[in-house]
């Protein structure tokens, strides 16, 4: 019995020594992560920039707000509460929002914030809603990437002008001033020989 106890002690000591000599495998552990803190590494600005605001002329409690990197938001109680109305569409970056002066329930949105900066996102054209932002339809100019302004002719809702900047870091694309006379079904460039257009004066 005494011999068995001695043998057991020897075996236990052998395994203890073996475990003590096992090298520690490299890897992440709690001490590693304690030295790290979350920090912003970009883009420069992720949201919060208001690109445009449109207010219903027939109901001043209804506003539409285009956010540079946050879609389109709507309030029906003069900003007490807000609802995102563009989240299911193809672009989160918005350059402008415009209401049809003849029917403010028709909303036009130009995607792609109109800012020349490394933080900016690009869009995929012009969108239209005929029901106050519930549903949307892409109306073209998908290669414009950055739209600064949309204006609807108050004398004819089928006539729309779009100021498109085009791609920031390359040539081509849909850039310039575009006009539609059929409600956005077709577009014709009326200004811009290879140059983008960011604004227009609609006092005509």
Segment roles from a protein language model:
Residues 5-16:
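Bacterial N-terminal signal peptides
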Residues 21-204:
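Beta-propeller blade termini and top-face loops
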């Amino acid at each position: 019995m005494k011999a068995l106890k001695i043998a057991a002690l020897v075996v236990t000591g052998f395994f203890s020594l073996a475990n003590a000599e096992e090298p520690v495998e490299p890897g992440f552990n709690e001490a590693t992560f304690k030295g790290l803190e979350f920090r912003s590494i970009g883009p420069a600005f992720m949201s919060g920039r208001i690109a445009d605001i449109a207010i219903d002329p027939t109901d001043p409690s209804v506003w539409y707000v285009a956010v540079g990197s946050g879609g389109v938001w709507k309030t029906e109680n003069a900003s007490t509460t807000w609802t995102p109305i563009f989240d299911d569409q193809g672009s989160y970056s918005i350059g402008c929002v415009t209401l049809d002066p003849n029917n403010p329930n028709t909303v036009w949105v130009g995607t792609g914030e109109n800012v020349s900066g490394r933080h900016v996102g690009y869009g995929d054209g012009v969108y239209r809603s005929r029901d106050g932002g519930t549903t949307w339809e892409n109306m073209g100019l998908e290669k414009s990437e950055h739209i600064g302004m949309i204006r609807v002719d108050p004398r004819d809702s089928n006539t729309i002008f779009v100021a498109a900047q085009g791609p920031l870091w390359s040539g081509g694309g849909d850039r310039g001033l575009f006009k539609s006379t059929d409600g956005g079904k077709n577009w014709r460039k009326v200004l811009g020989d290879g140059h983008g257009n960011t604004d227009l004066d609609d006092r005509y």
